[in-house]
């Protein structure tokens, strides 16, 4: 795959696809983490004299976070300490004329790419090439830099459509993500421990099955709803209240799949030995083997218990590779953040090379000032897809582009 330093950029127009899709409240972006992650790439292109055309999506149609990219241009202006213009168009005449008029070192931000219907559905590279987005924009750009790792599991025009039309290059963030995840996945250093929590149960099951079957993991620690699912699959009763919740979330249908994984890899999948319930507004820890587990019938499980944290901590401190995705409980409530803080702090203290991803995981790391993680991934779904052993469309497109245009480097 092409890397950023492979090309000269002076006076060349670069379409820079990033993922600045950020949490919003009352129409305002409340986290600039994804902006900061792509700054090295943008600064390098500016310093190299490129004309930088930034493209990103924000939210999904009809969602509260679906908005224009005017705010994104403003935040980039502040972070870069220069004027970054918001262009209220994507590939129409106005956008194309504005791109043609750009000067070296200038940066503009196109309108939310998902305002174009072509950008909302996944399609093959061949289909993406035929879109108006790719056909029109390719007339006014020279190179494509893709730094949108968080969207790497999607196959949409702005992400893969230019691969055979223009040289498509990894940005610094994409490069860093691919290198870190590959290092964790391919490592022979043992023990290799995967920590799977949160609510993305089906994705986590795919990861567990893949890394155990391909002998990429030596142990899997579970928490969050993933931990509850595997606990059920082991035959424990989590009570009426919690079963009802799991059913409502559509998680009970995965019990058979979890049982199948346990049948094949039982010693390698660890589940919580205790849970914390919300007992009338207070944290109460219940051992799975105690009589108090009857309280599961009436009170919701919101975290793993302290004994589980201690057992997981011992394992993590001896690990050489750690991959983690998803919190251990409802960390937004301080009394139920014990599991997430304890496990993530142990990962930070471990000598292991560690990778943590997922929006909620990252939010908890920043909220509780957890340090010592080797690599914090910007991709949740993309990271899970990678460790599930599935192909990421954007990485495949980068490989195709390299094969097509590698003669440019000779």
From Swiss-Prot:
GO terms for cellular component: cytosol. The keyword Disulfide bond does not apply. GO terms for molecular function: ADP binding; ATP binding; phosphoglycerate kinase activity. Substrate binds at residues 19-21, 34, 57-60, 114, 154. It is an enzyme of class 2 (transferase). Pfam families: PGK. ATP binds at residues 332, 358-361. It is found in: Cytoplasm. Coiled coil: none annotated. Belongs to the phosphoglycerate kinase family. This is Phosphoglycerate kinase. It comes from Pyrococcus furiosus (strain ATCC 43587 / DSM 3638 / JCM 8422 / Vc1).
